[in-house]
Regions:
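Generic surface-pattern signal
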Residues: 51-55, 74, 83, 87, ...
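A short, amphipathic edge element
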Residues: 79-107
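Short, low-complexity N-terminal intrinsically disordered segments enriched in polar/charged residues
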Residues: 4-55
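Secondary-structure boundary/capping signal
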Residues: 69, 73, 90-93, 120
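Short, solvent-exposed secondary-structure junction/capping segments
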Residues: 58-77
């Protein structure tokens, strides 16, 4: 009798643990599904930046950046860096998303393998929803 009670208790504990695992797995997947919208917005913003880069509209890129970036980087310095980047790397050719991460459903980190005419590199983009 004690043995049966032990096995029933053990079975009950295992079922509770499985339920908890399944619940948190489901919860995590729901959050990932909900994050797809902000990921797409972030990707669209990166596409916009690459388009502006190829057109040489660096001031537009600066204007799209967040306030903390503008506080840390003078407009003139940014424009100089971007002009130098174009001279060294060349025009943007293409990119492939390597990794993305959503933080608190408001911030997205995107890591791309980016191809330019002269070089290929990994670039990180951070999108913060206002």
């Amino acid at each position: 009798m004690k043995r049966n009670r032990f096995f029933l208790s053990l079975l009950f504990m295992v079922l509770i643990v499985l339920f908890v695992i399944l619940f948190f797995t489901w919860l995590g997947r729901e959050n990932i599904k909900n994050d797809s919208a902000i990921r797409e917005v972030a990707k669209e913003e990166v596409d916009k930046l690459f388009s502006l880069y190829n057109k040489g509209e660096y001031a537009e890129i600066y204007d799209l950046s967040c306030d903390s970036f503008k506080n840390a980087t003078a407009r003139k310095d940014f424009l100089t860096v971007m002009e130098t980047k174009m001279k060294i790397l060349g025009e943007f050719k293409g990119r492939k998303l390597q990794y993305s991460n959503v933080i608190n459903s408001k911030s997205v980190e995107l890591y791309y393998r980016v191809g330019y005419i002269n070089y290929s590199l990994i670039e990180e983009f951070n999108y913060i929803k206002n």
